[in-house]
Amino acid sequence: MREITIGQYIPGNSVIHRLDPRTKILITTAFMVLLFVIDDFTGYAFPAVFIIAVSILSGISLKYMMRGLRPLVIIIVLTFVLNLFMIKGRVIYEIGPLDITYEGLYQGTFMVLRLIMLIVGTSLLTLTTSPIALTDGIESLLKPFRRVGVPAHELAMMMTIALRFIPTLMEETDKIMKAQMARGADFASGNVVQRARSLVPLLVPLFINAFRRADDLAMAMESRCYRGGENRTRMKQLRMTSADLAAFIATGLLAVGSIMSRFIW
């Protein structure tokens, strides 16, 4: 559970770390949309190269980011299996009443690849952006909506805290599982339904710890006289540079290349 990378931050001074947080948020959003627009394997060659390039520039190894997929293996396998057996088409192999089709195999592999790129791509945002910078970036992007009554700072703070709590909750789950296994609990044996039922006793202590951490955070913010974004100043002002412009251009080329690939190959 502790291996999940979404929500974690690795300090650094790479060119990716130094990018304006608004740039990284917008590029990540565009990257996610692009993954759902692409509908063939050739188009995914460009996002794959993009992820590898960002990994090299950020100094965060691709192997480390792939570790974040381990807690989600069940979801990835389930996605593949559902597509494999549910999509009708040219039959490759029969397993009783179930048919494995060419179209199902193609779509299952395609969806797994999309899911992996989605997880790894979004992980890069939090891995290279500090919580403060992420909050400032989201708040700045939401600032125009203040005119219609949207609390930009509060919403940005909520989103950032939610992201940062993901690895914390995963760590809490891991600790509770180990404590219960030491007392004889078995989470590994049995069928899928039995394993799911064995996880129910984890929920009560997990929610109690989550509420306790949330209460501690609220008390810490209250003791520091936190009053939202009212009259709040920043030590570092957000300012885009030529590196941000280059990042936007690279993302634009990525989008064009991915979409045009269907007409080339």
UniProtKB/Swiss-Prot annotation:
It is found in: Cell membrane. CDD domains: EcfT. It is a multi-pass membrane protein. The chain crosses the membrane at residues 32-52, 72-92, 115-135, 150-170, 245-265. InterPro entries: ABC/ECF_trnsptr_transmembrane, ECF_transporter_component, EcfT. It comes from the Bacteria. The keyword Transport applies. GO terms for cellular component: plasma membrane. Belongs to the energy-coupling factor EcfT family. This is Energy-coupling factor transporter transmembrane protein EcfT. It comes from Thermosediminibacter oceani (strain ATCC BAA-1034 / DSM 16646 / JW/IW-1228P).
